[in-house]
Amino acid sequence: MSGGYDLNLFISPPDCNFLCSVCHGVLKRPVRLPCSHIFCKKCILRWLARQKTCPCCRKEVRHRKMVHVNKLQKIIGRLEVKCRNAEAGCQVTCPLAHRKGHQDSCPFELMVCPNEGCMLRVPRGALDEHRQNCQHGAYHRCSLGCGATLGPVERANHNCYRELREAWCQRQQRSRTLVLCLLQHMRKMHRTTGLIRRQLADFLEEDDPLLVGAPQEEAEATPEGSIGVEVWEPQGQATL
């Protein structure tokens, strides 16, 4: 892996004096050897782990003799660079020294979804939308205030007003059905009551002559002068 910065990162081609002779990238954390040659710190340490000589002049090198070139690092830090998410669509350019600060807020920077169990990496600008629809997201109450507890899938299809209207329509339909059932029952009772009343009227019409003629027959069967009362006498009592 290269220890320096990629040349394609820079808006303008960097000066050749800013290049590392080991990785051929722009110097990153430059250090100078006693022989005055400058390299990326990471590159020269890797080199010296294999051999103890300068990559350019082959002179022997000791670690304690390396010096950080802070002035050169500041000059390189002022070079204009592209965002590392330029291919993803970010058009921002900034000094190399400010690149890290931009990455921390770049909307194109890939972020890991914070929901437990989700391994997707999405751009920072789309993270909020992803969290709302993530299948691993937590359940939340409806933000519109209906009180429903919804998961990510339910939230995507949830519509308080539509569901309330559907519930109201269902209730109205049940009410209409109940009223129709009651009306049918009342009509049936009305028909039954009418039938009973007609049968009772017919019965009264048939029995009316009998009820009227009964007193006349009793009067004809009773002799004149008799009160029609039988006198009871105790048995065995002598007649005086």
Curated annotation (Swiss-Prot):
Signal peptide: none annotated. GO terms for biological process: protein ubiquitination. A zinc finger (RING-type) spans 20-58. Pfam families: zf-C3HC4_2 (PF13923). Keywords: Metal-binding, Zinc, Zinc-finger. SUPFAM superfamilies: RING/U-box, TRAF domain-like. A zinc finger (TRAF-type) spans 101-156. This is RING finger protein 151. One of its GO terms (molecular function) is zinc ion binding.
